[in-house]
């Protein structure tokens, strides 16, 4: 149940409703009782038929008769044409009726909406529901079209004849303005047997299927005055108006009875009784035969005797007799039906749940019809708390049912059964009976209030600084542990530790990125508490690691995991551990399955074990400041085990909010510029956790040294109601130069921007959110916390008796110079990776120059591990010294060039000047390993040492390694194309377009963008698995087992990330790869040219790897460190530039998967095939559920099961009406079909791409983008993307980007070409477009306090957006053509006389109102006027518009 339509605004599917005729559901400012469910199109048809209902309606039914139906419409009604949406809805209504799902003992009443079309259906219980569905609704759309009502914004159809009761009335009404007031009024009229009057009407004859015979009114025409009105409503003259005719006061003979229904008069009642009118009047002592005094529900005698007493008695347990409200009920009819007065009915319900009196009654509420205890209320399918949670048992008498099923975390429960922590949920506004709330509020029934619960002050106010141990991986903004200002903190947290699949603690990416070095330094901190934080967002949510926490806390594994963690903390003499699991029980984290609801209790049990194993250490956990995620934590019980909670009161908002209507109050799009550290929301979060039972002195509150950034939708609009660009997975904010993550920018980077005043547009403190706001480069917006704001927050939190504060993170605060002993951060990071102490000073370090070829590490190479040889020959210091010579002496002289760097290194090692390791082997004389004696022979004293041999030979492996890939992805493509590509790719390219795009796409500038995207992505997908296999087979790493495999993967990621950056960079003219991305004559040729791009990028990578830049030196250091590329006891690296058959086969598979996985869906898109993925809404067990949209054979050949959801890959073939372009007289219905070429996919063609991969990739892209289409192309520099592509997983988000939607959304787009642009992005899953008839809009501000509310104007736009609404207006004056609530949009012709009309389209209104709001919104109001040119029957005309 929902309390207003705003809660359903983002739903794009068909919606079916149940609500009272008398509930003004269009009023968004008051509460309602709206029951709703969605349909993906075929849902009613796939439910089991109610054979009992079907049998009951057909048994003893009279023969069908011919009936006269009226189809009418209102030409002047505002709104858009209902025809297209009505087709969708009537098909589903037919399924509902034909399967016996309607009512049989009362009228069938149903409300529905699709797009801006609202529909109401009424079928009296004397009419056969199935017959209405089969015979009437099946032809409704054609009938409307033939009645010239196809463009009407309000259409109705009825069978409603004078003299018949409401039991024999059928009506359907559709309006195109998105509202239900006129729909409710129509159904209310039909329920009273009052027919609608149409301005334009057409009568048609059709079959009328009956359950009971029609009343033959002519038979009684001479007996009953023909002008006497039948009953159509309950009469009432006072609050006790309902008469109780002849209520039996004592036992005596009672009569048989009949009940009054709408439309009855005494003659029809007598007919129901089967007696004459005279007898009927006699039995009931009726002297005045005026039917207007009859009351619906009232009983009359059909025989002699006393009218029975129908008033109920209490149930045996003392509970009152109950009644469930129906859509067409009111108090008068209920009272009359049960021999009660309205006053009695009111008195019986003073304590009934949600009773707010008779006006209105709410559908499905359970009320009392007698004295007695109030009943339990009806359950609500979506209730989370309170007495209406499904399955709630009736408690003992005297129990306050408001306290049943309290919310997790002691959160507030509102009257709708929803849990929350804001004032919307937490203020009790009850109006009397339990479960009520003041109009326009949600009320509160349990755990009300938002106050922060303060405990005693903490014994120590904690000052926690997080240190990102991985910060040396960034291209800049480094901090060594030694540079942390320890005086500012009581605790330093090292982020992050990780766990292996066997629950061993690891420092991830340790040696390769310097994290291990920083961790070792972290352990040496004295005077400050040292805590290792294990987990974090990435570890908790990465597809490869998310199960470690989930499985680790289970009973089978928790002791092992806890023991390993405890041993690690004790072995490293740390002061404690923090567990950062994000988040137990989470159901909606993109890319991974929903978690178990048992996670929380398992986590608690794990913490108990861990605490027992570390009784003298600090144990803490991280917890989210979000109710949605925190409710998965048994946080009160956890607080009793842990020392305190790191409370993440940041990231309250971010790019991920886009398209999420629940993420931001007052922002239905979710894309408003909001602070991620808003003080009001933070205080609400503090209330939540302290109300949940965590003492405030155990809550360590988060502050940040970074900001959340957005790309503003409009320059100059930077307030909290202004919006940003991009979808949930596509931030368009400028990345920081060091953090390199769009939407996230370090304080150090912010301060650097502020230092350049030319970039700064606005810089201020927003008082309401207590946040620094920076607007720069015109459209870049950042919410952040300066030191001043952080200090003020810290004081506030201390005053609230919080346990302290925690700052993420120390290394984001400022730019640090390299530690004083290092000449640069490049030198420092290289030393760290090499395990060389960067703080040792001197020209030559270590003993490498004094070692000789007689050393055991040289002589016994085949019997000593690689890492030991590297260490004993002091190669790390040798490399460090060589780099020092380059950066301090040679680079300033030679410049940053590839030959210069190689020359410098070779000179340092006295290895000759002819080496050029940046050239493809065998060129450059860097492809052959040399013996130690060769190096020792240079120089007078052999001071190169054997270390030079290890380093040089490592270079040759790199050279050959890179050339190995070149031979596969370059030489075999570039030289004669007679290898892999020639036979595998190029031969298939000739058939590629013919297979997947029989009509080839026209040449487009878009081809170049696609080619460049594939250049980086494809290189990653080809090279990553290749490098991972090569590095994993190195003797140095193979000997390390699982740890070695992890190192190989880390090195691969570093190499590939570097290669991708080179592939898309501008390189010097001397670079060997001179390929340029250019469009070719055909799409297939254009895409095929990327193969040359990959090979050239590989050659360029080798060239730049030896150019002496900071990034190249860092990668070289990673590659050669610890002896990865030398021979040892495990053997020598088997790398040469000749290519084996097995390697060719592997790379063939890599290339095929990378190329065709990207190119096939892209070709479908640009060729206009418009292939897309249907989300059926059904589990995988469903059998062909979409027969309305696809044939059974298509469903069987295009489906895939993913996460137990059934999906289909299809496309809209041909024209929407099922006809060919010649439009034959008879057309066959068209269905979605398999896109061209899908049937040719196999394990031996097109790279082995599968149907499942195409579907899964598209769905992953859709989900990662916040369940929205239009997500960005995958970023090969993204860690998750890199990991996926390294595993040849092309289903990573952003690689395959076919749109995803339900069948009915796509069908609406396909079948309404006037409202859908088939060339638009996302077709046919894009929303229907509005109509544009005007141009040249001008604007003038008219906003005052009396202007319409912005919220009403936004609702007006929502109601007409994407519709075919078109208004034709004459010149006779101003006309309001669209309105909602306080907001009206009107037009008036300017300066044209005569018989002239002009047109205004729905999109014109949307465009104008959107711009007016952005320009003139003031204190929630907007008013404006202006001019435009609109098309009309006399050409383009000047029209004045007004928003008032």
UniProtKB/Swiss-Prot annotation:
InterPro entries: Chitin-bd_1, Chitinase_II/V-like_cat, Chitinase_insertion_sf, Ecp2-like, Endochitinase-like_sf, Glyco_hydro18_cat, Glyco_hydro_18_chit_AS, Glycoside_hydrolase_SF
Catalytic activity: Random endo-hydrolysis of N-acetyl-beta-D-glucosaminide (1->4)-beta-linkages in chitin and chitodextrins
Organism whose genome encodes this protein: Penicillium expansum
PANTHER family: CHITINASE, V CHITINASE, PUTATIVE (AFU_ORTHOLOGUE AFUA_6G13720)-RELATED
Key word Repeat present: yes
GO molecular-function term, one example from the UniProt record: endochitinase activity
Purpose of the protein: Probable chitinase involved in the degradation of chitin, a component of the cell walls of fungi and exoskeletal elements of some animals (including worms and arthropods). Might be involved in manipulation of host defenses for successful infection.
Stored Gene3D superfamilies: 3.10.50.10, Endochitinase-like, Glycosidases, LysM domain
Domain LysM: 256-302, 321-369
Disulfide bond positions: 385-413, 407-419, 412-426, 444-448
Other remarks on this protein: In plants, chitin acts as a microbe-associated molecular pattern (MAMP) that is recognized by lysin motif (LysM)-containing plant cell surface-localized pattern recognition receptors (PRRs) that activate a plethora of downstream immune responses.
Its EC number(s): 3.2.1.14
Any GO BP: polysaccharide catabolic process
Family: Belongs to the glycosyl hydrolase 18 family. Chitinase class V subfamily.
Domain Chitin-binding type-1: 382-450
Pfam families cross-referenced by the UniProt entry: Glyco_hydro_18 (PF00704), Hce2 (PF14856), LysM (PF01476)
Alphabetic keyword roster: Carbohydrate metabolism, Chitin degradation, Chitin-binding, Disulfide bond, Glycosidase, Hydrolase, Polysaccharide degradation, Repeat, Virulence
The UniProt record lists the keyword RNA-binding: no
Sequence ranges assigned to domain GH18 in this UniProt record: 461-831
CDD domains in the cross-refs: ChtBD1, GH18_zymocin_alpha, LysM
Domains as described in the record: The LysM (lysin motif) domains are small globular domains involved in binding chitin in eukaryotes. LysM18 contains 2 LysM domains.
Protein name (database record): Probable chitinase LysM18
Traits of the deletion mutant: Leads to enhanced fungal virulence, with faster decaying on infected fruits.
